[in-house]
Swiss-Prot record:
Keyword Metal-binding: no
Gene that specifies this protein: P
The protein, known as: Phosphoprotein
Locations listed in the record: Virion; Host cytoplasm
Lineage of source species: Viruses, Riboviria, Orthornavirae, Negarnaviricota, Haploviricotina
This protein's UniProt keywords: Chaperone, Host cytoplasm, Phosphoprotein, Viral RNA replication, Virion
Coiled-coil residue windows: none
Post-translational modifications reported in the UniProt record: Phosphorylated by host kinases.
Main location as per UniProt: virion
Its job: Non catalytic polymerase cofactor and regulatory protein that plays a role in viral transcription and replication. Stabilizes the RNA polymerase L to the N-RNA template and binds the soluble protein N, preventing it from encapsidating non-genomic RNA.
Region feature Disordered, mapped onto this chain: 1-26
GO cellular component, one term: virion component
Length: 271
């Protein structure tokens, strides 16, 4: 029979609790009794300083860097080294240098592309302005040449030439095929019109194409907004061949006439 003393029983190590054994098997696990204990402040600060937040977008990191001061005029490596020192980080590894080089290259390409787009937009606007001026000048020269020729024929002692000038003045000429006209070109011609020329063209269009008296509109300031539904290119195209215009765009003319008549009816009620 083996006798065990009370002393030997007291010195025998107790069996650890099951949850403690599990925690020892996986040191990363935290027992629920200690889960609410905060980390030491210095450890939390070190982690926040040296490790970026999980899921941080590049745009968020760029905002922070753009707000940081840089020593402009230094090389890229000097500026990068300075920023890394400010952030408490060491020198770049080879992989990080490759990433930085890719970022710089992409940034330079984006900047060059943006400059290209700005230059292209400026060239386009400049060409459009020049084409508008050219169209206006060409039209003015054509009209001046036609008037000069008519005047010369009228002053000619030859009765046949005088009669030719008179016939040209009273006989409507055959218009061009307006279906072949470029709408953007017609818009440019419209933009080249003076204010008075635009008003005259609108008045002639409303009276002779839509067969509507627009006089009630003219008493109202900014009356032009009521005819905004009429395409501006049509205000130029109809003058090229009014007979063909009335035939080809008959449905649009009816719609425009009905719309304008409703607008005029409302204006009369308001007044």
């Amino acid at each position: 029979m083996i006798n065990t003393s009370r002393r030997s029983s007291r010195n025998k190590p107790a069996t650890p609790a099951p949850e403690l054994i599990k925690a020892e098997e996986n040191p990363s696990d935290i027992h629920e009794d200690f889960a609410d204990l905060p980390e030491p402040l210095l450890l939390s600060e070190a982690r926040a300083e040296n490790m970026p937040a999980v899921g941080s977008a590049i745009s968020d990191l760029l905002k922070v860097e753009r707000a940081a001061p840089l020593l402009i005029g230094n090389t890229v490596e000097e500026m990068v080294t300075g920023r890394l020192a400010d952030r408490g980080l060491g020198e770049l590894t080879e992989r990080e240098k490759i990433i930085l080089a890719i970022g710089i290259h992409c940034g330079e390409s984006s900047m060059e592309h943006m400059n290209f787009l700005v230059t292209k937009r400026w060239i386009t606007e400049e060409l459009k302005t020049q084409l508008t001026s050219l169209a206006a000048t060409t039209r003015a020269l054509t009209e001046a040449g036609s008037l000069h020729r008519t005047y010369a024929l009228l002053q000619s002692p030859d009765q046949a030439k005088k009669q030719e000038a008179l016939d040209a003045m009273v006989t409507p000429q055959v218009g061009i095929d307006i279906t072949t006209l470029n709408h953007e070109g017609l818009e440019d011609i419209w933009q080249s019109y003076s204010h008075d020329a635009k008003v005259d063209a609108v008045d002639d269009y409303l009276r002779n194409i839509l067969n509507v008296d627009p006089t009630p509109l003219y008493a109202e300031d900014e009356w032009g907004r009521h005819i905004a539904f009429i395409p501006r290119w049509q205000l130029v195209a109809y003058g090229k061949n009014s007979d063909q215009f009335k035939t080809v765009y008959a449905d649009e003319i009816n719609y425009q006439r009905e719309s304008l008549e409703r607008i005029l009816a409302k204006r009369v009620k308001l007044n």
